[in-house]
Curated annotation (Swiss-Prot):
GO terms for biological process: L-tryptophan catabolic process to acetyl-CoA; L-tryptophan catabolic process to kynurenine; ommochrome biosynthetic process. Belongs to the tryptophan 2,3-dioxygenase family. Disulfide bonds: none annotated. Binds 1 heme group per subunit. Its cofactor is heme. Homotetramer. Dimer of dimers. The gene is v. Substrate binds at residues 57-61, 128, 328. This is Tryptophan 2,3-dioxygenase. Heme-dependent dioxygenase that catalyzes the oxidative cleavage of the L-tryptophan (L-Trp) pyrrole ring and converts L-tryptophan to N-formyl-L-kynurenine. Catalyzes the oxidative cleavage of the indole moiety. Its EC number is 1.13.11.11. It catalyses: L-tryptophan + O2 = N-formyl-L-kynurenine. Pathway: Amino-acid degradation; L-tryptophan degradation via kynurenine pathway; L-kynurenine from L-tryptophan: step 1/2; Pigment biosynthesis; ommochrome biosynthesis.
């Protein structure tokens, strides 16, 4: 195979130096294609009853695992960059670039599911017996992705056993799992980063106090407007709706209420990190907050795409084996997979819910000159 980027396009150039071991590794050697392309062992073939679609099944899942490896590689580098007291603008730009790369990979993985769906349930049944006790639940790399992202052990849906039990006595796998659980996750590091958002300082701009004041004024104006409603029933409905909104805001302004929601699993961020996320959302048009806002958006994209991938997987499993059969690894199959679509598996849940706490643009506290100067010279 010729590479158009490594030649002038003339494959018969007499002056060209032939590729050899003296020049360096050739394409196949560099990519170790002899190992990669020889790693498809069809069990149906070994049983002398070859099933054509088993090859597709193997290739698709191997492709998933290769992309999982790249996602882990990107996550590890991003975690290293975030694990610092100060993150300058250059690093933030690189983090955004690598998160965007993960987003594009996940889009590719979501689009890969329909290829597997070209196989009919009957085709799958022809070789499904060879898969047991293998199961997608045993994908070590996907578990590492979840842990490095920030899926908490206590948030996981259990099916008859702890999620690590499927790795048995595989010391290498168990060590990798423990290391991913003990190391700071992307969620933890993003939380620390948000807690340092400039403008949260009580002896400085004190965004949180100004935001509370703006919310109080906004709700007071809403009450005043509702009181002018001529129809009593409509007025009472509007006042009731305003009180509900007041309770929603109370859940972020009262630290005790927020901490209770975190303990219950309904929120992920610390109280101060949530403040930072809200501030970045409000002032995303400010140059200093532009990249941080992109970063938060990409984290939501990653969560969304993983959920989409899970959903596509659930639908495919239901099409292939129905909703009553057990999975090949002994899990509850469709029922278990469907349970992973809940918010408990959404790592950056708080970012999705930020829109709940928005106020009209004109009510957002204006930045004063002091904080503007600070944002010019301070990295987030």
């Amino acid at each position: 195979m010729s590479c158009p980027y490594a030649s002038n396009g003339n494959e018969h150039d007499d002056g060209a130096i032939p590729l050899s071991n003296e020049v360096g590794k050739i394409y196949g050697e560099y990519l170790m294609l002899d190992k990669l392309l020889d790693a498809q062992c069809m069990l149906s073939m070994e049983d002398k009853r070859p099933v054509h679609d088993e090859h597709l099944f193997i290739i698709t899942h191997q492709a998933y695992e290769l992309w999982f490896k790249q996602i882990i590689f990107e996550f590890d580098s991003i975690r290293d960059m975030l694990d610092a007291e100060v993150i300058d603008e250059t690093k933030t730009l690189e983090i955004v670039k690598r998160l965007n790369r993960v987003v594009l990979i996940l889009k590719l993985l979501v689009d890969q599911v329909p290829i597997l769906e070209t196989m009919t349930p009957l085709d799958f049944m022809d070789f499904r017996k060879y898969l047991a006790p293998a199961s997608g639940f045993q994908s070590l790399q996907f578990r590492l992705i979840e842990n490095k992202l920030g899926v908490l052990t206590e948030q996981r849906v259990k099916y008859n056993q702890k999620y690590t039990d499927v790795f048995g006595n595989d010391k290498k796998a168990l060590h990798a799992i423990r290391d991913s659980e003990d190391s700071p996750s992307l969620l933890t590091l993003v939380q620390r980063w948000l807690e340092r958002t400039p403008g949260l300082e009580e002896d400085g701009f004190n965004f949180w106090a100004k935001f509370q004041q703006s919310v109080d004024q906004f709700l007071a104006a809403q009450v005043q407007s509702a009181m002018l409603e001529p129809v009593e029933r409509a007025k009472n409905y509007r006042l009731m709706d305003i009180e509900k909104r007041r309770e929603v805001y109370r859940s972020i302004f009262d630290p005790a209420v927020h901490d209770a929601l975190v303990k219950r699993g309904d929120r992920r961020f610390s109280h101060r990190a949530l403040q930072g996320a809200i501030m970045i959302t409000f002032y995303r048009d400010e140059p200093r907050f532009s990249q941080p806002h992109q970063l938060l958006t990409l984290l939501m994209d990653i969560d969304s795409l993983i959920t989409k991938w899970r959903y596509n997987h659930v639908i495919m499993v239901q099409r292939m084996i129905g909703s009553q059969q057990l999975g090949t690894g002994g899990s509850s199959g469709y029922q278990y997979l469907r349970s992973t679509l809940s918010d408990r598996y959404k790592v950056f849940l708080d970012l999705f819910n930020l829109s709940t706490f928005l106020i009209p643009r004109e009510a957002i506290p204006p930045l004063d000159e002091t904080i503007r100067r600070k944002l010019i010279h301070k990295s987030v």
